[in-house]
């Protein structure tokens, strides 16, 4: 595990970020984020990450060189627009926070309604039970056919939550993610499309 990744996780932890937000920011699973925030100092002192069993293996994805550039993001959005050529829809819903820039560019390119879904992991409240919500232009997608956009899908939980919420007010037709780590092709009858997919290959000597 890279020292840089451990340092980033610890920095975000010290800034008050919960494990869910750290996982999204670093494109790792919540389980890995929790492991790093709890054991990061010891890992740095040891000089290397101890060998872990296969259940703790995770893949770290970094695409800062793309998402930091509006021009490069627009090029990615054009690829997704091309993949949407056979899909009839009225609106684009970006999952906060990683999916919002892409959803904005896609809706602009195709002249579609735009909205944001804020997952419950980003809702900071003292209530035990909380839900996500539509954060912008809800009226523009009610009763409409929509697509869902996110940057990275790790466990699929945020996408599943978004689909469940939207099915109560709209008709989610497809989900588009840049990078898929989950290997999931469909959630609740909604197809998941990806630009790139990662996986772990167990090579035995």
Swiss-Prot record:
Lineage: Archaea, Methanobacteriati, Methanobacteriota, Methanomada group, Methanococci
Entry keyword DNA-binding: yes
Top-rank taxon: Archaea
InterPro entries attached to this UniProt entry: GfcR-like (IPR022854), PRibTrfase_dom (IPR000836), PRTase-like (IPR029057)
Family stated for the protein in its record: Belongs to the purine/pyrimidine phosphoribosyltransferase family. GfcR subfamily.
Pfam families: Pribosyltran
GO molecular function, one term: orotate phosphoribosyltransferase activity
SUPFAM superfamilies to which the protein is assigned, alphabetical: PRTase-like (SSF53271)
Annotated HAMAP family: GfcR
Keyword Iron-sulfur belongs to the record: no
Protein name: Transcriptional regulator GfcR
Gene3D superfamilies, A to Z: 3.40.50.2020
GO BP, one annotated term: regulation of gene expression
Organism: Methanococcus maripaludis (strain C7 / ATCC BAA-1331)
Keywords: DNA-binding, Transcription, Transcription regulation
Domain comment quoted from the record: Contains an N-terminal DNA-binding winged helix-turn-helix domain and a C-terminal regulatory domain (or effector binding domain) resembling phosphoribosyltransferase (PRT) domain.
């Amino acid at each position: 595990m890279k020292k840089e990744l451990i340092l980033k996780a610890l920095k975000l932890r010290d800034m008050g970020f919960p494990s869910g937000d750290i996982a999204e920011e670093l494109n790792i699973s919540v389980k890995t984020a929790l492991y790093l925030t709890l054991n990061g100092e010891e890992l740095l002192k040891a000089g290397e990450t101890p060998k872990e069993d296969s259940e703790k293996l995770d893949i770290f994805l970094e695409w800062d060189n793309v998402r930091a550039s509006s021009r490069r993001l627009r090029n990615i959005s054009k690829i997704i627009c091309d993949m949407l050529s056979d899909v009839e829809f009225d609106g684009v819903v970006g999952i906060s926070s990683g999916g919002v820039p892409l959803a904005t560019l896609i809706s602009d390119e195709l002249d579609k309604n735009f909205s944001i879904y804020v997952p419950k992991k980003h809702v900071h409240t003292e209530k035990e039970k909380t839900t996500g919500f539509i954060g912008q232009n809800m009226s523009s997608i009610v009763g409409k056919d929509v697509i869902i956009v996110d940057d990275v899908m790790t466990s699929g939980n945020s996408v599943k939550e978004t689909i469940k919420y939207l099915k109560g007010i709209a008709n989610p037709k497809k989900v588009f993610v840049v990078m898929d780590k989950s290997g999931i092709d469909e959630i609740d009858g909604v197809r998941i499309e990806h630009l790139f997919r990662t996986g772990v290959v167990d090579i035995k000597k």
